[in-house]
Swiss-Prot record:
Gene field: trpD
Protein name: Anthranilate phosphoribosyltransferase
PANTHER family, per database record: ANTHRANILATE PHOSPHORIBOSYLTRANSFERASE
Record: residues binding Mg(2+) 2: 224-225
Enzyme class: transferase
Protein role: Catalyzes the transfer of the phosphoribosyl group of 5-phosphorylribose-1-pyrophosphate (PRPP) to anthranilate to yield N-(5'-phosphoribosyl)-anthranilate (PRA).
InterPro entries: Anthranilate_Pribosyl_Tfrase, Glycosyl_Trfase_fam3, Glycosyl_Trfase_fam3_N_dom, Glycosyl_Trfase_fam3_N_dom_sf, Nuc_phospho_transferase
Record bears the keyword Glycosyltransferase: yes
Pathway assignment: Amino-acid biosynthesis; L-tryptophan biosynthesis; L-tryptophan from chorismate: step 2/5
Enzyme Commission no: 2.4.2.18
Organism (species): Lactiplantibacillus plantarum (strain ATCC BAA-793 / NCIMB 8826 / WCFS1)
């Protein structure tokens, strides 16, 4: 199958959903050589992946992941990465605030790729255990409204792809598949993308994957987040219907910050920023987290408009619930790991 796909791609012919799904499944079962995988990924990158190709590949990745069977709809807050902004861990900090506000969050992530600190790195630096089994993570979700699925453990078949990706050293379809391959099949999602051209295709892919409520965002200062330093382009998804809008800090009553104020560093540095935000320290990191938390809460609770969702995010931090959530997660993750 992969040989046929390579031939099609080199002729600039698109793959349909089924063929894309079959090829990625073949790759992730170890049935393709490194040379074949490298050729396939390079040819697809040159042609540029279509919605069918991305959706098929994401479906294959989901099917090969360790199962994580949730009992209720959950929310994912994630960025594609690759924006080269070196911002602190905005999505992860936002996820903790949203969980503290009562929304079940299933965060899927990894260690750093293009940044100095990935979601796994900063959660570990905060004292949260990340290497939990699915059963332990499900128990943590029930206790705390938050679970982290470490991509390396849930997508073990990615080991078949790693050598070819390292050898060809170019961005491939796998750079955008991670945020689409949440093992919990989250029905709600705040998805940040590193390039504006990816917004519309990935919005369509989310709908095909069964996501009911979502926002796909890209800020004009290049973040794969909603930015407190620039306007952010947004596609809102509600049961397959899409609406585009622009969000600015001023709409939330905030003063626009300099992009430099959002830059982080190592996992330890970013963990300190996260703690400061969760304990109510004012400044640009708090502002950007509040904006993203407002969007996420609006996705999860559509009855709240953005202004009400922003107020809920503020209350969650200022009344101590966010800091308490972090303390609970540290204690509970250690407890479930020991059980």
């Amino acid at each position: 199958m992969i040989e046929t796909a390579i031939a099609q791609l080199t002729n600039q012919e698109n793959l349909d959903f089924t063929m894309s799904q079959q090829v990625i499944t073949e790759i992730m079962k170890g049935q393709a050589t490194d040379a074949q995988i490298g050729s396939f990924l390079t040819a697809l990158a040159i042609k540029k992946a279509t919605i069918d190709e991305i959706a098929g590949a994401a479906t294959a990745m989901r099917s090969q992941a360790l199962p994580f069977k949730v009992k209720r709809p959950t929310l994912e807050i994630v960025g594609t990465g690759g924006d080269r902004s070196n911002s602190f861990n905005i999505s992860t900090t936002t996820a903790l605030v949203v969980a503290a506000a009562g929304v079940p969050v299933t965060k899927h992530g990894n260690r750093a790729a293009s940044s100095k600190s990935g979601a796994a790195d900063v959660l570990e630096a905060l004292g949260i255990k990340i290497d939990l089994t699915p059963a332990q993570s499900l128990a943590l979700l029930e206790r705390t409204n938050f679970a982290f699925m470490y991509a390396r453990e849930y997508h073990q078949a990615m080991r078949f792809v790693a050598p070819a990706r390292q050898q060809i050293k170019i961005p491939t379809i796998f750079n955008i598949l991670g945020p689409l391959a949440n093992p919990a099949h989250a029905e709600m999602q705040l998805l940040g993308v590193y390039r504006q051209a990816l917004m519309a295709p990935l919005a369509e892919v989310l709908t095909r994957l069964g996501v009911k409520h979502a926002m796909v965002v890209h800020s004009r200062d290049g973040l794969d987040e909603i930015s407190a330093a620039a306007p952010t382009d947004v596609i809102v998804i509600n049961h397959g219907q899409q609406v585009t809008r622009i969000l600015t800090p001023e709409q939330f009553g905030l003063t626009r910050c300099d992009h430099a104020a959002l830059i982080g560093g190592s996992a330890q540095v970013n963990a300190a920023i996260t703690r400061a935000v969760l304990t109510g320290e004012p400044g640009a990191p708090r502002d950007v987290v509040l904006m993203n938390a407002a969007a996420a809460l609006h996705i999860a609770k559509p009855q709240l408009d953005l202004a009400a969702a922003f107020e809920l995010a503020q209350q969650t931090i200022d009344q101590g619930a966010a800091a308490a959530k972090l303390a609970q997660l540290i204690q509970s993750s250690q407890a479930v790991m020991a059980s």
